[in-house]
UniProtKB/Swiss-Prot annotation:
ATP binds at residues 141-148. Residues 493-512 have a biased composition (Gly residues). One of its GO terms (cellular component) is nucleus. Residues 514-530 have a biased composition (Polar residues). This is ATP-dependent RNA helicase DBP2. PROSITE patterns: DEAD_ATP_HELICASE, HELICASE_ATP_BIND_1, HELICASE_CTER, Q_MOTIF. It comes from Scheffersomyces stipitis (strain ATCC 58785 / CBS 6054 / NBRC 10063 / NRRL Y-11545).
């Protein structure tokens, strides 16, 4: 899949499914994306859709594999039960168990096999037949479960079945995501698996110059991955349109609503023909997401992996220390000393505010720890650089706010430290879920203070379900219910369990690109530790 941002477009895509190239029955052709001379904005209004006059399009590409068709209802129920899979809706296709059973065209299957995946994930086993069948669907699964490929590969098949883009046409596939980091990661997957089809894509998000994004849209792209706010900017400026969109994805729908994007989502979806295929993906299923699905999905089918009851992964060791605010820094350093016993470990530290994020980063660097900060006040170029340094291990400690960390998928995070507790238990589970992925083990350390008392009951419930050791201070708090006052002192509990001693990160390199660094990321790095 060609990615304009990487400058590797080599020409138009091939038609794997055929179709009529003379696509001139009402889409596109709006005289280009130039907008007016002064880039005046035009308020978006909901089109009066006449489905009879809209060009027809194909969205059902699924043919059940003979091996899948031969399985008994008992076998299917056993498979779903084994993978904690539950489905809702009518005429739900049976799950597949291998890549070959999915029914992908050979050009897609070859891309998948080239990546060396042993087998589909649970969400892919059920999600692919659903998506390929053209149905509106809801997928509920944890972050890191393989949901991106669950909609990305069917999107490639969908695009190749549609007529080629004409000048002035907008995208065929639109993916909405809550953050620029997640949008970029989705784009990377789309580029990786669509290379043989020469499908073009671009990422449209805030915090970056509009010029390159506008040029990408003007050249024509089959896939747009966007954050809601920046996409509305482009639509109101006349730089793109959604008339060709027949495959819509809402990724991390719960997070988008948490971040207040519901009005923008509704405004965008109203610009898309109502007979499109819509796929909604979410880690949770709150009423707000249900209402959005009810308004925009037609006769949807749903697959859920795991229970709707909020739970933390059992591969994560949860350590909670009940301490005071002034003890946090000393405790943080002690845990970093423990974390460095694993040579190539990565540590993700969460802070509640941008100010705290910078203060912790500056403190750690002055103490000799190779830490970098990422939050919303950083320019996109610096955020990208920090993320690269963290992923490669050149800076193995990253301090982040919740918003900056949403959508970031980094492999090999061994430790998560909640320097500040989040405001709700859902964010706690989401934070600590950055470690212990894919069956690996991980450790999550949380500093619980008097200001976090409202979380006490829910935190005990999460830890108890995961069979974790609850420190006595937290147990006392749980018995007194919400709002109880905690007297600090005595043992902290939960500190053991993953070893002690100090190792090393193998040098202090990786800080050459100083032009990216601002604020706390420019704080001098002491040689005290390494």
């Amino acid at each position: 899949m060609n990615n304009y941002n990487n400058g590797d477009y080599k020409g138009g895509r091939e038609q794997h499914f055929g179709g009529n190239n003379n696509y001139n029955r009402g889409y596109g052709g709006n005289g280009g994306f130039g907008g007016n001379r002064y880039n005046e904005r035009v308020e978006l209004t909901t089109p009066d859709w006449d489905l009879e006059s809209l060009p027809k399009f194909e969205k059902n590409f699924y043919t059940e594999h003979p091996d899948v068709a031969a399985r008994s209802d008992k076998d299917i129920a056993a498979f779903r039960n084994e993978h904690q899979m539950s489905c809702l809706g009518s005429d739900i296709p049976h799950p597949i168990t291998t890549f070959d059973e999915a029914g992908f065209p050979e050009y897609v299957l070859n891309e998948v096999k080239a990546q060396g995946f042993p087998s589909p994930t649970a969400i892919q086993c059920q999600g692919w037949p659903m998506a390929l069948s053209g149905r509106d669907m809801v997928g509920i699964a944890a972050t890191g479960s393989g949901k991106t490929l669950s909609y990305c590969l069917p999107a490639i098949v969908h695009i190749n079945a549609q007529p080629l883009l004409s000048p002035g046409d907008g995208p065929v596939v639109l993916v909405l995501a809550p953050t620029r980091e997640l949008a970029v990661q989705i784009q990377q997957e789309c580029s990786k698996f669509g290379s043989s089809s020469r499908i073009r894509n671009t990422c449209v998000y805030g915090g970056a110059p509009k010029g390159q994004q506008i040029r990408d849209l003007a050249r024509g792209v089959e896939i747009v991955i966007a954050t809601p706010g920046r996409l509305i900017d482009m639509l109101e400026m006349g730089k793109t349109n959604l008339k060709r969109v027949t495959y819509l994805v809402l990724d991390e729908a719960d997070r988008m609503l948490d971040m207040g994007f519901e009005p923008q989502i509704r405004k965008i979806v109203d610009q898309i023909r109502p007979d499109r295929q819509t796929l909604m993906w979410s880690a949770t299923w709150p009423k707000e997401v249900q209402n959005l699905a009810r308004d925009y999905l037609q006769d949807p089918i749903q697959v859920r992996i795991g229970s709707l009851e909020l739970a933390a992964s059992h591969t994560i060791t949860q350590v909670v220390e009940v301490i005071s605010e002034y003890e946090k820094r000393d405790r943080l350093v002690k845990h970093l000393e423990t974390a460095t016993t694993e040579k190539e470990s990565k540590v993700l530290i969460f802070a509640s505010t941008k100010k705290t994020c910078d203060e912790v980063t500056s403190y750690l660097r002055a103490d000799g720890w190779p830490a970098l900060a990422i939050h919303g006040d950083k320019q996109q170029s610096e955020r990208d650089w920090v993320l690269r340094e963290f992923k490669t291990g050149k800076s193995p400690i990253m301090v982040a706010t919740d918003v900056a960390a949403r959508g970031i998928d980094v492999k090999g995070i061994n430790f998560v430290i909640n320097f500040d507790m989040p405001g709700n238990i859902e964010d706690y589970v989401h934070r600590i879920g950055r470690t212990g992925r894919g069956g690996a083990t991980g450790t999550a350390v949380s500093f619980f203070t008097d200001g976090n008392n409202k979380l006490g009951g829910d935190l005990c419930k999460i830890m108890r379900e995961a069979k974790q050791t609850i420190p006595p201070e937290l147990q006392r708090f749980d018995r007194k219910s919400f709002g109880a006052h905690i007297r600090y002192g005595g043992g902290r509990g939960g500190r053991g369990g993953y070893g002690r001693g100090r190792g090393g990160y193998g040098g202090r390199g990786g800080y050459g690109q100083r032009n990216y660094q601002t604020g706390s990321n420019q704080a001098p790095l002491s040689n005290r530790r390494f």
